[in-house]
Amino acid sequence: MMHHSLYLQTSEFEETPKHWELIEHHFPCGNNLATAIKAFQKINYFKYKKILVSVSGGSDSDMMLDWCVKMDIEKKCVYVFFDTGLEYEATKRHLNYLEQKYGIKIKRIRAVKPIPLCCKQDGIPFLSKEVSQNMNRLQRHDFKWENGSYDELFLKYPKCSSALRWWAGEYKDGQTRKKITVSSIKLLKEFIQANPPTFKISDKCCHYAKKLPSEREIRSGGYDLKMLGVRQCEGGIRAMAYTSCFTENEDKSYDDFRPLFFITDKDKAQYKKHQGMKNSDCYEVWGFIRTGCAGCPFNSRFETELQKIKKYEPKFYKACVNIFGESYEYTRAYREFKKGVHSGQIRMDLGMF
């Protein structure tokens, strides 16, 4: 039996030996156990009356869901899936499997604007959220993808300040912050100038299909805690946006909890084996290591993903190509452009591009 000196008493919930035996039984020793204790206390904290657990059908989400089902003594958790309007059949089947396995109901929330419609109306994702966001702003102001200092360009495009700073690489303090400029991405500026996009670029699908539906559900549902299966070691914009597993929001009606934040790949694999868990066919059959929005061009490995989709869900593959095809081709052209410069076939010094 564990010693209570190991616990941080963060709630008025009366923990009993029975509860700790439950945790010891389900969670192997090590980081899984220590992190599970924190999650148990947070879920059963008296302050939280209704908890939104965001279920995606991915492997991290599966682990978090398994925790919640086993830890939620007072049944405060509501399991919610945000349907983007472009989902794998494998994911849909897995959600049904999870409902049957755990005897729960997963609430499906539709996108405010489904991804196919959003891409048609607002633009298609290209390369990354930041790149798409800034290119969208520039496109809306009929930017000509030209060179010039920020001050020179601002005279021509006075209502596009932030995106111009990204393009010119100049900021108010006079310093170039390379991490957030177009020049920080190798040869991207040169490629865009040589091959201006002929289609609208945007990151709005993330907003309308995920962020906005989540905000609306939280407001209308009266939740006071939101749980998300983000892990620090997985990287990406989501993980980099946080420094800890918990955010107490003074300006919102709910707090954010990321119970798996400090869980490593090894911890996760150990837990899956210990519990005999089964992930969706995207992992078990297709061989995916991780999943994001299906077919999204933000995925640097979208070519490999498309090959898998074409093999296992050919109809879905056609949908992805129809929706994101122009972005796929633009990304391929960018990659070939970089290869051409590196091989000397494209001469930057002579302007042969």
Task: Describe the residue ranges of each PLM region.
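ATP-dependent adenylation/nucleotidyltransferase module used to activate substrates
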Residues: 2-267, 272
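ATP/NTP-dependent adenylation/nucleotidyl-transfer catalytic domains that generate, transfer
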Residues: 3-6, 11-24, 48-50, 253, ...
